[in-house]
């Protein structure tokens, strides 16, 4: 799976985190591992221009998705076997997202993770124009985001444990060297 991120927003964000959440969602949705995704981060002026050009709506927005191929998520019972493809582009506006994050009481990173999940789901054909579609998409979005966060927490704890184990191992080697008369 190839995920490219281009940050033209002027705001420092964790590209690794964006790639991580996108890769997680794409994997959970059974998209072919050879799929490609492009993510672009823009400032509010560039996002407002894109929003007007493609959606005919004034002002910036948080996320826009531009699917390249007609795809259905592989996890859906009515979906055909997934094949390699270009999923499309997700465009994020960190400056706009920062305002939303502050209003929601969480970090910009958390907001961008949410918007990345939202953008990937749009690329896979999910929408929220109708109430039943919104209910389905937002429930799936919440579930995927919670699973990704849990996965990140578990990885963090495993990494911390590995660091502790390595320190103990290093100490035991030091004591082994002392007991055998070797100098460290």
Swiss-Prot record:
Binding residues annotated for Zn(2+), in chain numbering: 118, 122, 128
GO molecular function terms attached to this record: metalloendopeptidase activity; RNA endonuclease activity; zinc ion binding
Gene Ontology terms: cellular component: cytoplasm
Chain residue ranges for the region called Disordered: 156-184
Cellular localization per UniProt: Cytoplasm
Record EC number: 3.1.-.-
Cofactor (UniProt): Zn(2+)
Disulfide bonds: none
Keyword terms: Cytoplasm, Endonuclease, Hydrolase, Metal-binding, Nuclease, Ribosome biogenesis, rRNA processing, Zinc
PROSITE patterns found in the cross-reference section: UPF0054
rRNA processing found in the keyword field: yes
Details of cofactor binding: Binds 1 zinc ion.
Basic and acidic residues bias spans: 157-184
Pfam family, one: YbeY
Gene Ontology biological process terms in this record: rRNA processing
Function field: Single strand-specific metallo-endoribonuclease involved in late-stage 70S ribosome quality control and in maturation of the 3' terminus of the 16S rRNA.
HAMAP family with a match to the protein in the record: Endoribonucl_YbeY
Family under the similarity heading: Belongs to the endoribonuclease YbeY family.
Protein name: Endoribonuclease YbeY
Source organism: Mycolicibacterium vanbaalenii (strain DSM 7251 / JCM 13017 / BCRC 16820 / KCTC 9966 / NRRL B-24157 / PYR-1)
Gene: ybeY
């Amino acid at each position: 799976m190839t995920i490219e991120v281009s940050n033209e927003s002027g705001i420092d964000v964790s590209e690794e985190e964006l790639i991580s959440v996108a890769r997680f969602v794409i994997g959970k949705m059974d998209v072919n591992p050879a799929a490609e995704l492009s993510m672009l981060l823009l400032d509010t002026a560039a996002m407002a221009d894109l929003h007007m050009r493609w959606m005919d709506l004034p002002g910036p927005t948080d996320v826009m998705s531009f699917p390249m191929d007609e795809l259905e998520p592989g996890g859906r019972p009515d979906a055909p076997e997934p094949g390699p493809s270009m999923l499309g582009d997700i465009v994020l506006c960190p400056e706009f997202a920062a305002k939303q994050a502050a209003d929601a009481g969480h970090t910009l990173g958390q907001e961008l993770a949410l918007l990345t999940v939202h953008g990937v789901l749009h690329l896979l054909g999910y929408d929220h124009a109708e109430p039943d579609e919104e209910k389905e998409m937002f429930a799936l979005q919440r579930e995927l985001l919670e699973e990704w966060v849990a996965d990140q927490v578990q990885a963090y704890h495993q990494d911390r444990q590995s660091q502790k184990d390595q320190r103990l191992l290093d100490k035991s080697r030091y004591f082994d060297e002392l007991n055998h008369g070797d100098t460290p």
